[in-house]
Amino acid sequence: MLTLWTVSLFLLGAAQGKEVCYDNLGCFSDAEPWAGTAIRPLKLLPWSPEKINTRFLLYTNENPTAFQTLQLSDPLTIGASNFQVARKTRFIIHGFIDKGEENWVVDMCKNMFQVEEVNCICVDWKKGSQTTYTQAANNVRVVGAQVAQMIDILVKNYSYSPSKVHLIGHSLGAHVAGEAGSRTPGLGRITGLDPVEANFEGTPEEVRLDPSDADFVDVIHTDAAPLIPFLGFGTNQMSGHLDFFPNGGQSMPGCKKNALSQIVDIDGIWSGTRDFVACNHLRSYKYYLESILNPDGFAAYPCASYKDFESNKCFPCPDQGCPQMGHYADKFAGKSGDEPQKFFLNTGEAKNFARWRYRVSLILSGRMVTGQVKVALFGSKGNTRQYDIFRGIIKPGATHSSEFDAKLDVGTIEKVKFLWNNQVINPSFPKVGAAKITVQKGEERTEYNFCSEETVREDTLLTLLPCETSDTV
C-alpha cells in the first residue's frame, strides 16, 4: 500500500489523448490545468464510466444493513427504493484504493441512522480508485460528474432540492465531491475529510475542492505534513469555509505505534496495515464517525496557529461560539463568513476521540515550597482524572492557570479536588492549599469559583466547594 501511495504518483498507467466525451457527463481534456503543469505533469484522461463502474448504494433507516442500488441509467430505481424526498441525502465518497462497501463507509450511515432519518448513499468507485494514483486522481473528474448527474436526476425527476444534499468525501473522494459541487448550483454542503495533496494542492479552484463548490464547505485536516519527506497524504491548503486542524493537523495521537502492533490490529490485518501506512490520513473519517454520536465533543477554537492554541491563547470560545468539528459543523452561526476560518482542537489517541476543554486558574495558599499542583473536576455527569496545573515554586498568593482536554463533559461542576506533592522528603511537613480555584468550560464564558481556607500536606486531597458570594468578590 505504501508503494502504491508513493511510487504510483509517477506512473503513467493509461493512454494519452486530447479529449474524451461521455453522454450526460460532458467532455474531459488533458489540457491545462488538468495536465501538463508542474503539479500535474502527466497528460492523462479519465477512464470511461463503464470502466470505472461507479455504483450508488442506498442505505436508509428502513434498510440500514442491506443497500439498494440506484442506477444512473434507470431513474425508476430511485422511485422503487426506500429513498424519501422529505429527508436530507448524504453521499459518502471513498478515496484512493478504497471501496464503497468498506466498513467505515457503511458504519457512517449506521451512525447517522441513530440520530436522524436520512438517505445515505455510498458512492462505490473502487474500479477507478484501485489503480495508479495519478490515474485515480484523473478518474475523480468522471466520478464527480456522475455524482452531479445523480443529484440532477433527483432534482429533475423528483423535485428534490440540492440544498438538502450533503457530500462527504475522504482523500480523493473530497475532490470528487468538489467536482460534483462545481457542477451543482445550490448544493447544500460538502465535507472534505483530509482532502489529498498530491496533484491537487496549489492547483486552480476548478481542479480541487474549494469553498465555491457548495453553500457550506467544511474540511478536516489530519495528515497535512508535506508529502516529501514526511509522507503526509493530506493537503495543508485552506479548502473550505471552516477548516479544522485537530491536534495541529499533521500528527494524530495514537498514530505512532510500532509497525507490528499497528499491523496486527484488533480490527484485522487489512485494517491494521491501512492504519500503519496512513493512520493520520484515516483519522479524519474516524473523527467524523464519532462526531455523529457526540454533538458537543469536538468543539474547535479559532486560532492563528496550533502553537498559540497549545499556549492557551485561544480560550474560551468567542461571543459567536465555537463550531463542532464533524457532523454538526453546519450548526455554527458564523459558518458563512467571507474569509476562510481556521480552527484547532485536541482529540484522544483512540476511541473515544471526543474531548472537552477546561481552563483552571488557582490562587495558592500555605507554605512556600517546590512542587507540582494537580486538580480534578467533579460534576453532575462524572469526574475527571487529576490534571497537572503547575510545576515549580509554590508561593502563597501566586496565581497559576492551565487548560486541559478531559475525556468527558462533567456537566455542572459541583466541586474541585486539589492535590500537591514534591516527591522529596521534607521533615517540616509543609502544608499547601488553594484559596480559590476558578473553572471555565471552553464553550461557555461563565466562570465557576470554588474556595477553601484549608491547607494540606503533600499527597492529601483537598476538596473545594462553591465559594460563598462574599468570597468571589
Swiss-Prot record:
Carbohydrate-modified residues: N157
Q: Which Pfam families match?
A: Lipase (PF00151), PLAT (PF01477)
Q: Which PROSITE patterns match?
A: LIPASE_SER (PS00120), PLAT (PS50095)
Q: Which cysteines are joined by disulfide bonds?
A: C21-C27, C109-C120, C255-C279, C303-C314, C317-C322, C451-C467
Per its UniProt record, what SMART domains does this chain match?
A: LH2
Q: Which residues lie in coiled coils?
A: none
Q: What is its subcellular localisation? A: Secreted
Protein family per UniProt: Belongs to the AB hydrolase superfamily. Lipase family.
Q: What does this protein do?
A: May function as inhibitor of dietary triglyceride digestion. Lacks detectable lipase activity (in vitro).
Name the chain's protein: Inactive pancreatic lipase-related protein 1
Q: What organism is recorded for this protein? A: Rattus norvegicus (Rat)
The uppermost taxa in this organism's lineage are: Eukaryota, Metazoa, Chordata, Craniata, Vertebrata
Query: What's the name of its gene?
Result: Pnliprp1
